Amino acid sequence: MRVALGVSYNGQAYNGWQSQPSANTVQDRLEAALGRFATQEVHTICAGRTDAGVHGLMQVVHFDTELQRAPFSWVRGTNTFLPADIAVQWAQPVPDAFHSRACAVARRYAYVLLQSPVRPSVDAGRVGWVFHALDEQAMHKAVQHLLGEHDFTSFRASACQAKSPVKTLHRIDITRRAPPAGESTGTHGCVPCYWRFEFEGNAFLHHMIRNIMGCIVAIGQGLYPPEWMRTVLEARSRDAAAPTFSPDGLYFQGPVYGAEWGLPTRTAAYDWLP
């Protein structure tokens, strides 16, 4: 039988999702826990690999097994052997035709950014950080140039193994969580607040969102006009873009599947995310 799992994790301690020789990865920890619960080797396939330091709110994986277990037994049993920063949220039997990666029609990511004169402490490792005020209107204008199907070579890491740099971005939303009423403007007019950037696309290149974030922040700080984003995109050269932004605030929200698979979506447990 084939089983799908929804998995969440804090990526700070891991060298990304994908299993690597002599490396501490989320996939290695998950498969080790599944193996201990199932008392047999288990191999998983995920919906989307994440880089070192990147978090997962609802990674979806599937695996094949001969064991017959109730869905919640897979949840409880696997979590027993997982470290505290990884958790299986749900388990569900799926048809053999289901494939966590191939059946996903889209993928969603969020980047959470703290704007503050002082670096994050409690949120360290869970949010990105800027100490300059960002121009919301300029950032909104800039990301419009990225919507649709494009060659995203300028935002692709040199180590990217994707066959094609052409991807489609369906949506980029930018929201700001305002500070409490009456709060001071802080240093140099930098009002402490959280920014949330949400991306939805058919697929993403290695470091693509972090490279886009570097450009968005540069434009938000007034270093470049919004039109610079199109210039970078059309250059089709990594050298044209801003430096890769920190992985700390990047979250894989999860894949999007057709209703025919009947899989759970993002859980209310993460409504706290700024």
From Swiss-Prot:
Catalytic reaction(s) noted: uridine(38/39/40) in tRNA = pseudouridine(38/39/40) in tRNA
EC number: 5.4.99.12
One Gene Ontology term from the biological process aspect of the record: tRNA pseudouridine synthesis
Alphabetical list of Pfam families matching this protein: PseudoU_synth_1 (PF01416)
Alphabetically ordered keywords of this record: Isomerase, tRNA processing
Record carries keyword Transmembrane: no
One GO molecular-function entry: tRNA pseudouridine(38-40) synthase activity
InterPro entries from the UniProt entry: PsdUridine_synth_cat_dom_sf, PsdUridine_synth_TruA, PsdUridine_synth_TruA_a/b_dom, PsdUridine_synth_TruA_C, TruA/RsuA/RluB/E/F_N
Annotated substrate binding sites: Y109
CDD domains referenced in this protein's UniProt entry, alphabetically: PseudoU_synth_EcTruA
Keyword Isomerase among UniProt keywords: yes
Cross-referenced NCBIfam families: hisT_truA
Family: Belongs to the tRNA pseudouridine synthase TruA family.
Subunit (UniProt): Homodimer.
Function: Formation of pseudouridine at positions 38, 39 and 40 in the anticodon stem and loop of transfer RNAs.
Protein name: tRNA pseudouridine synthase A
Species, as recorded: Acidovorax sp. (strain JS42)
Gene this protein is translated from: truA
